[in-house]
């Protein structure tokens, strides 16, 4: 069975034209991107490295990594989002190899091809996140880095990420997230371990609604980032 939720694909396809509008539904992604980029670069030193961005969407993270000197491949199954990413790459003059392919299929085609793999804000949108984690591990070279970011599953995450962000503050469209698909760090850590990835860093990501600034912290109750490394 394909590890694709067509409703999720359709959801992001309808918003595809807004990916690079920093005042749109994608504003939070633009705001957290510098934080994500620094977290990735601090661990993997991506300049000159081959990096794969899984679930790249409109290319926000992919372009920023390319601007840091990485050789970036971005993959997504939402064709409209991918077309936006390709056009923006051409307009920006930032070369990125974008492909419409499932991560599991790419893993079968290109095992061990990348120095680092990123899978950010994507696991909570697929039926089988463990399949994605395994594929990411297969795609990275021995000793390479795999980065994940997703949402914890608890009452606080539900109140802030679903009720607060989607229904009170209107930061995200209603229905963006399905709470049952949120992943506890322990669950994601277990998936990573079973895939041959060792946990290196676990960090929370917080948002101050007054200053409108995101920062890394020790609170993983809602959003969190995980840096893992494949054994040599």
Swiss-Prot record:
Enzyme class label: transferase
Pathway(s) where this gene product acts: Cofactor biosynthesis; ubiquinone biosynthesis
Task: Name the catalysed reactions.
Answer: a 3-demethylubiquinol + S-adenosyl-L-methionine = a ubiquinol + S-adenosyl-L-homocysteine + H(+); a 3-(all-trans-polyprenyl)benzene-1,2-diol + S-adenosyl-L-methionine = a 2-methoxy-6-(all-trans-polyprenyl)phenol + S-adenosyl-L-homocysteine + H(+)
Q: Out of the domains of life, which is the source? A: Bacteria
Family of the protein in this entry: Belongs to the methyltransferase superfamily. UbiG/COQ3 family.
What this chain does, per the record? O-methyltransferase that catalyzes the 2 O-methylation steps in the ubiquinone biosynthetic pathway.
Q: What is this protein called?
A: Ubiquinone biosynthesis O-methyltransferase
Instruction: Name the source organism.
Output: Chromobacterium violaceum (strain ATCC 12472 / DSM 30191 / JCM 1249 / CCUG 213 / NBRC 12614 / NCIMB 9131 / NCTC 9757 / MK)
Tell me what gene encodes this.
ubiG
């Amino acid at each position: 069975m394909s590890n694709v939720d067509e409703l999720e694909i359709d959801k992001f396809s309808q918003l595809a034209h807004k990916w690079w509008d920093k005042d749109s539904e994608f504003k939070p992604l633009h705001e957290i991107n510098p934080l994500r980029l620094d977290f990735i670069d601090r661990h993997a030193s991506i300049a000159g490295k081959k990096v794969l961005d899984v679930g790249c969407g409109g290319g926000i993270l992919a372009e920023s990594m390319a601007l840091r000197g990485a050789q970036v491949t971005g993959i997504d199954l939402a064709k409209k989002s991918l077309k936006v990413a390709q056009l923006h790459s051409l307009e920006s003059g930032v070369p990125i190899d974008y492909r419409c392919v499932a991560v599991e299929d790419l893993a079968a085609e290109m095992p061990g091809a990348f120095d680092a793999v990123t899978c950010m804000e994507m696991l909570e949108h697929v039926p089988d996140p463990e399949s994605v984690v395994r594929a990411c591990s297969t795609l990275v070279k021995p000793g390479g880095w795999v980065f994940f970011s997703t949402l914890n599953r608890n009452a606080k995450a539900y109140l802030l990420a679903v009720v607060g962000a989607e229904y009170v503050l209107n930061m995200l469209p209603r229905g963006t997230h399905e709470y049952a698909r949120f992943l506890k760090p322990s669950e994601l850590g277990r998936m990573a371990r079973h895939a041959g990835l060792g946990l290196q860093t676990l960090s929370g990501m917080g948002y101050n609604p007054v200053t409108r600034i995101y920062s890394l912290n020790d609170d993983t109750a809602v959003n969190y980032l995980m840096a893992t490394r494949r054994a040599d």
